[in-house]
Design a protein with these regions (language model features):
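A short, N-terminal "cap"/entry segment at the start of jelly-roll beta-barrel domains
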Residues: 1-59, 114-116
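Glycine- and acidic-residue-biased ligand/ion/polar-headgroup-sensing regions
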Residues: 66-67, 84-105
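Histidine-centered metal-chelating micro-motifs
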Residues: 70-72, 78-79, 121, 128-141
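Double-stranded beta-helix
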Residues: 98-127
């Protein structure tokens, strides 16, 4: 990713954190990750992250989804003899469409199908203040709601 692209997305993410009322230290502001998984399609498959802690068992992050961005489908697998991580999504700003293993049909979702393989369509809609926890080894993907921006 070009430095110019990285800096552009960091600025957008910091603006979103501010709109969401999330106070960040200077160290945190300088540690924003811009994630595109090497796909070079950040406007569609990507997100911006501030990581507060990330160990083998626990992780705490604030994630920004900008207009049009989707976090690709994945699961948290066992690592080093430990089961995969639980993950709790708490919507802080905007709306988040979370798709997890369970009943659901791709023709019935409120979001849009990203240009990558997705196989789970059980839809959980999160509004500010709402949260949902998934267990280890649960397939999931997520994207911002109708205004196409979200902080989770």
């Amino acid at each position: 990713m070009k430095r110019e692209t990285y800096e552009k997305y960091v600025k957008k993410a910091l603006d979103m954190y501010e709109k969401a009322g999330i106070a960040l230290t200077e160290k945190e502001k300088n540690s924003v990750e811009v994630v595109d998984w090497g796909l070079d399609n950040l406007d569609v498959l990507g997100l911006e992250i501030i990581t507060y802690i990330n160990t083998e068992r626990v992780c705490a992050k604030e994630m920004v989804l900008l207009p049009g961005q989707t976090c690709a489908e994945h699961m948290h697998v066992p690592t080093n003899g430990q089961e995969g991580k639980e993950e709790t999504f708490r919507c802080r700003y905007g709306k988040c469409y979370l798709y997890v293993t369970g009943e659901g049909n791709k023709d019935d979702i409120q979001g849009y199908i990203p240009p990558t393989d997705v196989t789970v369509f059980h839809e959980v809609v999160l509004n500010p203040g709402e949260q949902y926890t998934i267990m280890p080894e649960t397939w999931h993907w997520f994207q911002a709601g109708p205004d196409r921006k979200s902080v989770v």
